[in-house]
């Protein structure tokens, strides 16, 4: 079987070519994901949490059915509720060209594994046994973020782009997540294309809470397998929060060979239709978060998230909201000034990751 390399150019539909995220000499990998509310953090940085609960076991599954179920397990488990924080919070609006890089040590990596730096890719200083990740804000109007991750030795990769549109809905705020992601298994030549649910901030004037809602799909063109997932919003009267259901089909089959249901922030149970065997697809309480590895701020480039927002972060940790506001405005004013200079000179914006 011919081994497939990832595309050298990543392009989100609707983006000008000047806002294209490009990757060169990549022939590697990536996997897991998890939505989390993070503070203090820029959204460009926080999307990396989708990769925090890694399921590299996708590549170890023997059949297309097993691999699709494993992709669904990873996808659904990645949305569970995130870190609690007692510090003051201030929203960070990612600036154009902002980058975030990190990597994770994997549990299944050999203690004496290959520690040679890969020398290229999202995080050139990590090893082939580690999962690396990079995110870039590739457009400001509209706000589009692009992401890429890979695990060299497992030969699995993940790339995605996301554009959010917000709308007030009375006492709620709705966030429409426009975009898609692709999990690529290089050795078996399979690509799993997925979409994202919408988010809702409820009871914004009293005790706010967040839920997901809408239909999403995960599809593998090569194997013909497809998962239809429904994130169910809570009814106005009664009902449970955070419900999710899933059906997985093979080819043109009318009957799902695997179904799942539960609460995405606690536990989801699955069932194999043919055998009737039931299983716990995932349980959040058994999931151990992994600590991401990031360069010290002093060694980061000027456009990397933690360096861009360092003064805002310091103010938030000191519970100084006025200081955080001033620092945030300074960052945003610099962005506006740079945009005016580009407009005056006719310069087109080029993405940073090449």
Regions found by a protein language model. Give the residues of each.
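Extended acidic, Ser/Thr- and Pro-enriched interaction/regulatory segments
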Residues: 1-56, 60, 65-354
């Amino acid at each position: 079987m011919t081994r497939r390399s990832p595309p050298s150019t990543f392009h989100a539909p609707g983006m000008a070519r000047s806002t294209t995220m490009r990757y060169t000499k990549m022939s590697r990998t990536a996997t897991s994901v998890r939505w989390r509310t993070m503070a203090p953090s820029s959204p460009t940085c926080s999307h990396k949490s989708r990769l925090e609960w890694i399921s590299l076991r996708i590549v170890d599954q023997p059949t297309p059915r097993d691999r699709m179920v494993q992709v669904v397990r990873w996808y659904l488990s990645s949305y569970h509720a995130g870190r609690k924080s007692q510090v003051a919070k201030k929203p960070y609006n990612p600036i154009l060209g902002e980058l975030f890089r990190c990597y994770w040590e994997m549990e299944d990596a050999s203690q004496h594994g290959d520690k040679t730096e890969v020398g290229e890719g999202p995080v050139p200083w990590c090893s082939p046994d580690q999962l690396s990740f990079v995110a870039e804000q590739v457009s400001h109007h509209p706000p589009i973020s692009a992401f890429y991750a890979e695990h060299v030795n497992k030969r699995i990769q993940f790339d995605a782009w996301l554009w959010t549109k917000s709308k007030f809905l009375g006492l709620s705020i709705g966030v429409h997540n426009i975009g898609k992601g692709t999990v690529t298994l290089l050795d078996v030549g399979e690509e799993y294309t997925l979409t994202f649910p919408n988010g809702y901030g409820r009871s914004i004037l009293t005790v706010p809470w967040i839920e997901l809602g809408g239909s999403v799909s995960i599809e593998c063109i090569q194997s013909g397998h497809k998962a239809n997932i429904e994130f169910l919003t809570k009814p106005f009267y009664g009902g449970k929060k955070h419900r999710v259901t899933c059906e997985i089909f093979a080819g043109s089959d009318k009957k799902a060979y695997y179904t799942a249901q539960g609460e995405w922030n606690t536990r989801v149970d699955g069932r194999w239709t043919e055998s009737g065997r039931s299983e716990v697809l995932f349980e959040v309480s058994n999931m151990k978060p992994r600590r991401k590895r990031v360069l010290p701020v002093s060694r980061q480039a000027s456009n990397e998230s933690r360096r861009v927002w360092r003064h805002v972060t310091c103010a938030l940790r000191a519970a100084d909201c006025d200081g955080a506001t001033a620092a945030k405005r300074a960052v945003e004013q610099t962005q506006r000034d740079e945009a005016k200079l580009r407009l005056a000179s006719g310069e087109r914006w080029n993405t940073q990751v090449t």
